[in-house]
Every structure is written in structure tokens, then in C-alpha cells.
Amino acid sequence: VKNTDSCFMTFSPEELDGTRIKGKKALDITIQLAIECGEVATKYLKAPHDLEYEKTFDPFFLLSKKRYVGMLYEHDINKCKRKSMGIVLKRRDNAPVVKDIYGGIIDIIMKSQDIEAAVLFTKQFLKDIIDEKIPLDKLIITKSLREFYKCPESIAHKVLADRMGKRDPGNKPSTGSRIPFVYIKTGKKVKLQGDKIEHPDYIKENGLKPDYKIYITNQIMKPVMQIYALVLEQLKIFKKRKKGFERKVRSLERKWKDDDKKCVEYIMKERNKHVKELLFNEAELPVPIERT
């Protein structure tokens, strides 16, 4: 049996005069250093443990534990592919519109590393959503129907499935089937999230209007903020806020000097707050509703 685990290392190669090395040269040096690190570390590990070089990422976004995306190189600095784990592009319970905007941002950053181009793409995409230019099929979410729920009235697609069964008893959704739905405008406040969704066919037949903004607050905002929070200092629109942000970070570092985990957590919250204000607040979005 061979058990494996990963150890990520960061290298910042410099010239003798202290100038940071970038591009393909930095990538080549990093690969060689990583190979050497593995060989040296193995000498100090108890057999049969062995630390071997596997891959190098450039660029690389580490969102959280087991959630990352980057361009993967092995030994050839001219040959790479995109590699990701645990990001929204892998989730089945997100609407296609989420994958379109998130995937578009990732593509731009991974291919050209042009943060400003990614920001422009994001703003235009959000505008298209708010202007209701996104087709209905891009808003469809699907979730599997289970046999039992402890609180069925709080499970949106279960509420919808029951409603569909009452409308057409002969075609009531069965356990295990995937229920497609779209968030709709209700014209009044509703308590249950299940009352804010409908089947795509029913929407078309009855001329109902999709609630586009909920897709921003409930599915798009969080993952997109996590990306830009990591490159906040590189955003041109952040320039005027930078000094105030740095003061806040120093304050948090002093407050949580004995708790690194809490310090990182609160700094990331501060980063996300700035991204939200810079990219999302101007959209006049509703308060996010709880997801099920």
C-alpha cells in the first residue's frame, strides 16, 4: 500500500543584486529547487518515507484547504495544463451562469495573468445579469430529491417537487430524480425559499420572471470575492483604499498576534469586504438568502 500526501512550498528566486526573477527563468529555477528539496528532505526521513517532486504551479490560487486552481507544470517549462480542486467549477448544484463567470475569470488570470482584464470581464458579466440578458437555461439549478428530510419545508427543491406533484399527480417527481429549478420574482415577501423557485417549463408557460440578482448574491458573489481577495493589492480600483487597508491589517496583526489562525481569518474578511464594496455594492443587490 502506498499512501501519499502533498507538501506545498513557495520559492521566490532572486538575482545576486536582489532583483526578483520572473517568468520562465523563475519557473525553471523553481522546478530544480523543488527537486533538490525533495532529495535533501528524503535523507532525513525515516524509511520508507520519501519526499518526491511532483509538480509546480504558476500562477496558483490557494483558496483554502483542498481548494485551489493553477497552471500545472511538471518538468517541461513550456508545457502546462490547468489543474483545480474543490472550486465551484466542480460543483453540480451551481447554475451554469456561475461557471461561466467564475470560469471566465479563471481563464483570463491563468492564461494572461491580466487582473484588470478579469475585472472588466467581471463587471460586464454582472451588468449583463442585472440587465437580465442571461438566457433562462443558464439559470437552471438541479438538485437530487431524497426519500426523507428532517425538515422538508426548509428544503427548497422538496417544496417545489411537492408543488409539482399537486399540479400534475401523474408526473410527481420520484426519489432520486434531479429537480431543475430557477429563482423567480414573487412580487411579495415569502417565508420559504421553496416559494421563490419554479420549474423552468412552468416559468415559460406562465410568463414568470427570473430573479437574476439572487444568482449574484447566493451563487456568484462568494466564490468571485475569494478570487479577487487574493489579488486585492493588484486591483487599480483598490489603490485609494490601500493605505487604510494596510493600517487595518497592522491593527489585526497586533490584536491577534498570539493566534495566527484568527489573524488570517479576520484579514481575509477585510479583503472580502473591500472586494464586495468595489465590485458588487453598485449593483444594488438584495440581502443574500439562506441556501439549502
List PLM regions with ranges.
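DNA-dependent DNA polymerase catalytic subunits
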Residues: 1-4, 11-292
